[in-house]
Amino acid sequence: LQNNTIDSSLNPQWYLYDNGNYISHIKNNSNKLQTKNISSSGSQHEFIVSLGGSLNEKIYLGATIGFPTLNYYELSVYTEDVLEDTINNLEGFSLEEELSTNGDGINIKGGAIIRISENFKIGASLHSPTYFNIEESYTSAINTYFSSNNYTEISPSNYFKYELITPWKGVFSASAIFNKYILLSADLEIVDYSFTKLNSASYDFRYENEAIQNSYQKTNNFRIGSEINFDEIKIRAGYSKYGSPYTNNDFYQEGYSLGIGLNKNNYFLDIAY
């Protein structure tokens, strides 16, 4: 909200300038201890309403309406302590910045699974963008510490409302069973990160949206997994490859997994890595 700048109303509390000739409040070459602490917390939840059905046990259809919520809080404190005596007994400064973000949104997901045969299925799903309405508040304060007194100046609270539209996602999947003992499944996920957009009635996000479109791209993510069933013991393995969301970047991320499961007399034990 502040473009990483300090509200001009806070400047007098720094005591770093004078309306006449410059007078330093700190000795030249004095030692200073600079520290910065950032504490943050947040969460995201989603309430969903789903509906599903089948046609002749061959085609399975499903749809979901999601209502996600998010919240985020951050407190940043920058402190500068003067470790030596100063001209005016100045001991230090601190800058406190507080950011609070809350939002709610809506999205739709739909999909279908087709059973080609008893042992082979294919499926597809489409996840719409999530349309978030977000509210943010930002405040800052400057504290100046002298040996004889302290001074504090608090900036006016800044409030901002905007819309965030997240990328859409499509998933294609297939699974097959071989000889009743081997299960093989694969997913192809397509995500267009360049679709992300910001909108606001009080601010023109044209340049930010252009930067998003120029910096991000559509990416393909691939996952494959297998399970071998030895009656009471099951062996599992998986592999994933995620493409880079950034343009002009060939980076990709790979993942591997192994697992074993035990099922005996209604007791289950699963170990995975």
Regions found by a protein language model. Give the residues of each.
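Outer-membrane beta-barrel porins/channels
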Residues: 1-273
